[in-house]
Structures are given as C-alpha cells and as structure tokens.
Amino acid sequence: MPHKVSLSRLKLTDFRNYAAAALDLDGRHAVLTGDNGAGKTNLMEAVSLLSPGRGLRRAAYGDITRVGAAGGFSIFAALDGMEGEVEIGTGIETGEETTARRLRINGTQAKTADELTDHLRLLWLTPAMDGLFTGASSDRRRFLDRLVLSLDPAHGRRASDFERAMRSRNKLLDEGRFDPSWLAGIEEQMASLGIAMALARQEMLGLLTRLIEETRETSPFPSASLQLSGFMDGQFTRPSVDLEDEYAAMLSESRYRDAGAGRTLDGPHRADLIVHHREKAMEAERCSTGEQKALLVGLVLAHARLVGNLTGHAPILLLDEIAAHLDEGRRAALFDLIDGLGGQAFMTGTDRAMFSALGDRAQVFTVADGKIFE
C-alpha cells in the first residue's frame, strides 16, 4: 500500500467567500456538504493550489481574493507529506503582480512552485470536466499534461519553456524577420522540448493503459483505451534524436506557411487525446453523458492508482460532486475504490446521506455562508 499523504490543517484568509476559515483533519477522507454556492468547491480550490499552476478553476490570482478584502489572499496547510511533516503557505499580497504567487515551504521561500511536487501530488475531478471528451482539444491536452505532471514534475517546466520558444518564433515570423540562424536556434530548442513533452505523454499513456487492462475485471467503471493523435503519429518508437531532427526540419520547412497562418501549425501543442469506451468499442465523444462521466471517473481513479504505484505515495484526490447521479450501489463501489487507493480524498455534495456508505472512513463537514462546521 502506498504511503498516505494527508492534510492535517487548512487555513484560509480572504480566499473567495471565506474571510477566515480553518479545517482540522484527522487523516481520513473529508466530505464537504452544503447548499450550492456555500463554498464547498472554494475549499477544494484552495487545496488544489498546493500544486503547481492555477488550481482546479484556473482562475487569475487577483480574482481569488475575497471581494472587499483589504489585502490579498493566503492559504496555509500542514500535512504529512512525501518527505515527512511539512507546512506550506501560499498567496498574494496587495499591489503584487498577480500573475505569480508567493510560496513558502517550512518557512523558506520556494524558488518555484515545482517544489510542491516534492511533498504531495494532487488529482481532481470537477463537474466542469464533464464535457472533456466533447470539448476543445486544448482542454484534453491540459488534462493530459496534469496527469503527466503528477508522475514527471519536470514536464510542466518543459511545456512552459516550449510555449515560450514557440511565442518567440511566432513573433519573428509575424514581423517578417526570417534570420536563418536565429530561427534555427529557436527551432532546435522547440524540437528538443517538444519531443521530450510528446515522449513523456506517450510513456504515461502506456503505463496507464497497462494498469487499466490489469484492473479491468474488478473496476466498477468502464475501461478507457487511450491514444494520442495530431503530432508525429506512430513515430515514437524511433530514437528521440531522430525525432528531434525531423521536427526541427519540419519547423524549418514550414516557416512561410506558419507566418501566413499566424501560428505554428505542427507540434505537441496540436496533439489530441483520443479516448474510447473499450467495452462498447466506441469513441468517448459519442457515448451518453452518463457513460462519459463513468469513463472519466474510472480514468482519473486509475491514474491515482498509477501515481501511488510508481511514486510510493498516494495522491490527494479532490472529487467535486463525485456522488451525484450515481445509484446507491455504484456510490458504495466508488467509495470502496477510492478508499482502496490508500490516500486522502476530499469530496463534496449537497446531501450528507449520499456519503453514508463511507461510514467512519470520513470526516463530514457542513459548509454554510463561508463557515465550516463538523
């Protein structure tokens, strides 16, 4: 069983609808119940900001601060992490550039948010993701990259460096500055980073596919088959150096085409995650809404198991409205599966009775008007 990473305390100041709030946890799962709009998802969002990035809502930091607050917002968390007990603080202050946030780990200023992955890994599932299979390919890429990031913390830096290099190339092409040596240098950097990104995605999907196959008979959810499409399809068994050379040549040959288009038309930023319902042999986008939700839940929980298996530390799960629209039997099976992962899960719902099958495996809190009651 993987080591259980768990929060023991969460404290918020001027975060969303919370002027001040504290949550004391005993290591069990945490169930947050209350009316819609009470602030349950806001608590989940605060926990999600203990990982790199902008959290489960991807909100601008300035928008997170409570309306009417004199300063910025702050989040404090104490947890039993991957390297032992740790305290994490993050937030912004009044007048700060709100594209970045401050981060302190055990009282020391962190150099980058990537340091958070030394202490915990987070996965989440929200109602906003229900349209993942029918929505824009950019949403699926973002979802895929978060899955990769939980196994390969360097992936986020590679992706941001690739985007930065691509913007530089696009700017040069837009300005008509076709300096061969300058562009070649940028394109070589894009090739190195882009192929590394694509290989990391392929490796993660291969590992996840094998785990789904191994647990197919025991999972209460349908099995997903996964593949990438849209960038050098079928080529990733070749040596990476050959792939880098080919992609760099592709970029060089497409300069005038990309200049006309106003963007780079080939690369990992154009790839798409293709998901099929294995039992039905059907593309996920053609499945019913309920089947899509079941596929997505099964996929996220399978990935959580993979993270625990490979890192030795179970991820913390944030499952917003996870029990909605499930019958009693499937809810019980879901809770058993979550509990069997060996980690701590935060779950929300409007009805406390929906979580009765958890029994004493969870602390249950009521959220109302920016207040939390156990």
UniProtKB/Swiss-Prot annotation:
Superkingdom classification of source: Bacteria
Main location: cytoplasm
GO CC annotations on file: cytoplasm
Classification via CDD domains: ABC_RecF
Gene3D superfamilies the record matches: P-loop containing nucleotide triphosphate hydrolases, RecF/RecN/SMC, N-terminal domain
InterPro entries: AAA+_ATPase, DNA-binding_RecF, DNA-binding_RecF_CS, P-loop_NTPase, RecF/RecN/SMC_N, RecF_2
Pfam families referenced in this protein's UniProt entry, alphabetically: SMC_N (PF02463)
SMART domains in UniProt: AAA
Record keywords, A-Z: ATP-binding, Cytoplasm, DNA damage, DNA repair, DNA replication, DNA-binding, Nucleotide-binding, SOS response
One of the protein's GO biological processes: SOS response
Presence of the UniProt keyword DNA damage in the record: yes
Family that this chain belongs to: Belongs to the RecF family.
Protein name, as recorded: DNA replication and repair protein RecF
Species per Swiss-Prot/TrEMBL record: Rhizobium leguminosarum bv. trifolii (strain WSM2304)
